[in-house]
Amino acid sequence: MPLINLPEFSAELLSEFDARKAERIDTPVIQPAEPFLDIAGEDLRRRIFMTESETGASLCLRPEFTIPVCLRHIETATGTPKRYAYLGEVFRQRRDGANEFYQAGIEDLGDINIPSADARAIGDATGILARLLPGRRLSVTLGDQAVFEAVVQALGLPLGWQKRLIHAFGNMTQLEALLAGLVSPQFVTGLDDDIARLIAAGDEQALIAHIEQEMQATGYSTNASRSPPEIARRLKEKLVLSETRLDDAAFHVLEEFLSLHVPLVNASAALAGFADAAGLKLGNALSRFNGRVGALADAGVDLSCLDYRAAFGRPLDYYTGLVFEVTAEGSSAVLAGGGRFDRLLTFLGATDRIPAVGFSFWLDRIETERAAA
């Protein structure tokens, strides 16, 4: 179906994609809802337009392109490396602006040279924007979830707390609430006395048997709710997490890390200095970060317009490393955003691990910037 009401610069944009050897791909507007509900993140989940098929399968209007492009790649059993380009409508409930709008972007799948692919994504996003917005100086904010994960792991927190903090990365309100809970734990109350005793005794089999007995007695079906072993595991994890306290020194280390905001050219030294002062070994995460900075310089990207902010993330749960957003200098409107999503294709059903990075353009915002020039 032909697209209508496309921005007037669409032909120029598609020409830029062609010049970067990205193959144009189309994906259905109606998508299976499950992948988005499972891994797209709370911010996107609450904006999705849901529907269902005649058979009751949950469907949605396409809210973004990364997951559909990855699903299409898996369905067609296409080899890698592969670069895809897309331009089409997405549908999201928004407070401001239309609920349907155009996005375009590139997904770069299967390039095992991670620093080079990351640098290419940032270089392509800024390079194309520079062509569409001649004379406008751009500003890029860059974060790295892998570095945050390395800091959290090096502090030796329980795995459950690590998962919670990593899941909240990029959402400072949620992250601050979790850190407050670590500093001043709220102990679990209201547990059944028998359950509390079995958890304290560490008798997992007896705990599972007790939960199963209670479920049968109260008429809960394991088909309609969590299984007894899963409930037991979650109860134990909840109790462990509630009893974990982050000491003041570790709390201040996390605070100091999250406050880092420096020009990218100074970021490697700032991270190394932070790790040394805190006594943390960040190993591969730092070397990968440094490799990306070097690759950006080698690719000719103007590093003077790039900032590193340690607390910066994007509200999509599938990112695993690099995340970035591009604005016009002096404006808060995000014109392009992207990052690395190395686990996404495996989660969606790919048999092999496929490293991936990509970015998308907000065409309505670019159109506004062009009109204001």
From Swiss-Prot:
Pathway assigned to this chain's UniProt record:
Amino-acid biosynthesis; L-histidine biosynthesis; L-histidine from 5-phospho-alpha-D-ribose 1-diphosphate: step 1/9
> Where is it found, in Gene Ontology cellular component terms?
cytoplasm
User: What's a BP term from Gene Ontology annotated to this protein?
Assistant: L-histidine biosynthetic process
InterPro entries, per the entry: aa-tRNA-synth_II/BPL/LPL, HisRS-like_core, HisRS/HisZ, HisZ
Q: Where in the cell is it found?
A: Cytoplasm
Q: Other notes on this protein?
A: This function is generally fulfilled by the C-terminal part of HisG, which is missing in some bacteria such as this one.
Which family does the UniProt entry place this protein in? Belongs to the class-II aminoacyl-tRNA synthetase family. HisZ subfamily.
Q: What is this protein called?
A: ATP phosphoribosyltransferase regulatory subunit
The scientific name of the source species is: Rhizobium etli (strain CIAT 652)
Lineage, opening ranks: Bacteria, Pseudomonadati, Pseudomonadota, Alphaproteobacteria, Hyphomicrobiales
Q: Which gene encodes it?
A: hisZ
